[in-house]
Each structure stands twice: as C-alpha cells, then as structure tokens.
C-alpha cells in the first residue's frame, strides 16, 4: 500500500507527497494539526491540511523571514514573532548576538507543544533563555505593546481563517505603533505568481503607513508555485542600503550577504505588484 | 467528474493539476506527446507525461535561457537551439536586433508540428524569416558544425531517455567546437534542490572545457521544486561583467537587466554546487 498526502494549494493545483506515516494528528481549539513523515521532505507540519514547514526546506523560509530584517536593522535588541509556533523564526533570531529578547506570540499552544515533540531541529530555541513564549492572540499582543520592538516578524498561516486579521491594515497600523522609532516589520505574503491581488493590496497598505516598503522573494519547494515573498515595512533603515560587507558570517544554508541584496531584485512581473 | 493530471516529479513527489480536456495525444517515433488544457496553467505540453511548458509560466524559462547568454555576448548574430521544439527559445532569440540567423535543431518533428497547432503563442516565431528549422539529432548537428555559432542553447528534456546525451561531457566538447571563438552556451540543468549530483558533475565538466562557467537560477512553478537552474559555459564574455545599463528594454515578463545580474547570486546551499 502507498500513502500519498495531497495539499490542494489552489482549487486547481496540488502538491502530493509519498508518506511513510502519520506521527501526530489532532483537532486543537483552533485548527487541525498534524505531523506526517514524507519521503521527499521528511517530517512535515500541517495545519488544516496545509503544509506549514518541513524539515527539508524550512531553512529557506525561516532564514529569509528573520535575517533580512535583523541585518537591515543596525542593532536589533528585541524582536517579536507573531505566529510561528514551530519556533523556526525564533531559532534564527537568537543567532544574532545583539538580540537580548525574542518574544513568540502564538495563538495555538498545541502548535508549540507538538513542534517541540516532533520537530526538535526547528523548535530547538524555544527554551533559550532569551526567549519568552506567549500563548495568545497576536493582534491583541501587538495592540497592547507600544514602542517596544526593533523587529516584528509576522510568521502567519495563509490569509484565510484564524490568520486573516494578520493581513489587515488595522493590524499593520498596530504593528507600526508596537515598533520603536527605527523599527522594521516583515510579513510572509504568499506567492507573486498566484496571489497578485493580495500582494498589491498589502503593499499599498504598508506604503500608506511606513516610509520604506519593500518586497523580497525566495524559493521554497513546498509552498504554492515554489516562489514566495515577504513584505517589509521599515521606519528608518532601507534594506537596499544595508552595508552587506559588514554582515557577519552566520550559520545558514540559504541566506548570505549577497542574497540579502539579490532577494529584493524582482522579475518584471513581480515589480508590477509594487508600483 | 473531475480530471486531474499528475506528474510524479520524483518517485515521492508530484504536482497535480485539474484538467479541462486533452487537446492532443499521440505516440511519436521518440516519445509520448500530449497537450492538455489545465485550469491553473492553461495549455500544457507533456512529453512522456512530464510537463515541458505551459502557457502560464513558459515565459520564465524561455526568457531566462535565451536573454541571459544573448545579452552576455556583445554582438550575437547566429544562434542555435538544440531541442526546444515548442519554439519558445526561438521566439525570444529573434527579439534581439543583432540576430541574423537562429537555427532550431529538434529531433522530434511532431513536437514542432503539435506546438504550432496548439501553442501558437509559444511557437509563433518558428516561421520567422531568420529562423531555420532542422529536424534531426542535435548531437549530430553540433558535431557537424564547427566554429559557427555565437550562442548555443541546450533546451532539452530531463537527462533520462532521448536527452541523456545532451548532458554528457562529449557533447559539451562538441558544443565548444561548434561555437565561435567568443561563443557562449547555456543548458537547462534541473533543480538545485533535488539534482545536486547532476549539477555538480555538469559544472565540473563545463569548467574543464570553458574558461568561464556560471550557474544561474529562476522560479518556474511547473518544474520540480519551482526553482530551476541553467549552466553557462563561455569562451570570452563573463555574464557577471555584463554592462547591464546598456541592455535595451525588450518585451519580457521576467527578464530585466537587474535580473541578469541577480540570477547569478545563489543561496548558500547552491553555491556549494559550483565550488
């Protein structure tokens, strides 16, 4: 018998992976949560049947969502991750020597607990002494903290269901207020190939709030189309002006100083989205 | 009833697309050839059940395989495409004003004929007056022509079955001899995420023959992992030294002068492949 897991990434497109076994499956207060072991990508975290991260390619997403804003900022001391209960973004954040505190605010306690059990290589820094884990609503947390963080990372699920509010202009406004006067936020904002309307709208919203708005991309095999983007809003520092020669060599598999620059260079069709 | 076409991109990974109808299907002298109409990517050309090109995302592959070498060369007049019977690479080549002649050498006459019938937006330049279409073995053609082309594009299927010889060092040696003294060739060389051994071997082979060897990448949703690479061997011109400010604006959707530079900037794990 062969088992294949299929995610329908759009109503007319799917990715299908041969599966060794289901390691965990439950219905949490918020969503269906599962960890399966696939042949191609190893262990894979699923929320409502959608691939969140896999041990084979998680490095791309987590390195790119964390190091690009952290190295754009001159001296980040305090960072917040909204969502990201698997801990991958936190793991990358604590690699930065200047970081004194990293807060994770994840709404679903079970995502954290299951990641700790089944994805130790991703969640490994959640017990780091610099890390505070808050189980709660990220929108509420952001609204209750003002002028506090150097970097905020919106490490959310897709903009349907529980994460919808994390893609709204009201939330970006709260993020602005939650950042210090030279703060930077980054949000994962889906695929430039198939989420054009969403990205165009987000860019417009962020531009209306932040003096510097940028879009950057990377290659993630298990996400729809394999091509993914992040939107950055920055109060002071421009990632295009980062002195990449000053970026220290850190332990990464995708991110490097040259990629810090190249990730912002968009193909023509994607440049149209940020006009 | 719903019809879904699934390509198994590896033994443990597949892409699946909802399909409106099969427009064409036949067994040619060389392979199974089909054109299907999918909801997500429109018309799609399949050879032996493997996606070759789709009307939705073909622009990435064809622009990147053609314009990068053509704009690296200072004054390309004569270009050869080995394979590429759909005509997409030829369509891009004839956009260059300096091109006087473009030869297509495709082994399977039916690929050309079926592309002309079902993929007119891709094959549209095959009847251009600058284009010569040769139905024949690309290896034989290259071996019989010496010191003749400015740019050679190896627009092949995967390195199994009929195209295997197009990934061999003997063929690259013949390509070297077929190029003029300042010639450049580019070959499609699969995915940096899952074809690491192949790419490492090709880079080593090309380095042993050409003074300048480069790897560049782009994002192609319908190819395995969505992240694709091309290997360039050049006798004189280095694409990293192209004066990108001198590149004229041409009608493209992915390629642009900035991408000409950025495509060669590789994430850390891919840089390992070319060491």
Curated annotation (Swiss-Prot), chains A, B:
| Function per UniProt | Catalyzes the irreversible transfer of a propylamine group from the amino donor S-adenosylmethioninamine (decarboxy-AdoMet) to putrescine (1,4-diaminobutane) to yield spermidine.
The record's annotation in InterPro entries points to: PABS, PABS_CS, SAM-dependent_MTases_sf, Spermi_synthase, Spermidine_synt_N, Spermidine_synt_N_sf
Q: Where is the active site?
A: 155 (proton acceptor)
- Cite the NCBIfam families for this sequence: MFS_SpdSyn, PRK00811.1, speE
Compartment list: Cytoplasm
Q: Which family does it belong to?
A: Belongs to the spermidine/spermine synthase family.
Q: Which PROSITE patterns match?
A: PABS_1, PABS_2
Quote the protein name from its UniProt record: Polyamine aminopropyltransferase
Q: Which organism is it from?
A: Acetivibrio thermocellus (strain ATCC 27405 / DSM 1237 / JCM 9322 / NBRC 103400 / NCIMB 10682 / NRRL B-4536 / VPI 7372) (Clostridium thermocellum)
């Amino acid at each position: 018998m062969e088992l294949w897991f299929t995610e329908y990434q759009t109503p007319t497109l799917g990715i299908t992976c041969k599966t060794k076994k289901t390691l965990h499956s439950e219905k949490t207060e918020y969503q269906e949560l599962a960890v399966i072991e696939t042949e191609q990508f190893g262990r894979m975290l699923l929320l409502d049947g959608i691939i969140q991260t896999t041990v084979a390619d998680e490095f791309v997403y987590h390195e790119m969502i964390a190091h690009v804003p952290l190295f754009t900022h001159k001296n980040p001391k305090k960072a917040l991750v909204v969502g990201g209960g698997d801990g991958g973004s936190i793991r990358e954040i604590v690699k930065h020597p200047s970081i004194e505190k990293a807060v994770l605010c994840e709404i679903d306690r079970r995502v954290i607990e299951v990641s700790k059990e089944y994805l130790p290589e991703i969640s490994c820094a959640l017990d780091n002494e610099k890390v505070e884990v808050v189980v709660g609503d990220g929108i509420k947390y952001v609204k209750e903290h003002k002028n506090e963080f150097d970097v905020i990372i919106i490490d959310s699920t897709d903009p349907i269901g529980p994460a919808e509010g994390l893609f709204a202009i009201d939330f970006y406004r709260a993020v602005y207020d939650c950042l210090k006067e030279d703060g930077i936020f980054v949000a994962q904002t889906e695929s430039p190939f198939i989420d054009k309307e969403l990205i165009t709208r987000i860019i417009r919203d962020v531009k209306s709030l932040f003096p510097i708005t940028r879009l950057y991309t990377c290659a993630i095999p298990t996400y729809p189309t394999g091509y993914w983007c992040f939107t950055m809003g920055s109060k002071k520092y421009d990632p295009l002006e980062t002195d990449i020669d000053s970026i220290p060599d850190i332990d990464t598999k995708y991110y490097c100083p040259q990629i810090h620059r190249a990730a912002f260079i968009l193909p023509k069709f994607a440049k149209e989205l940020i006009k």
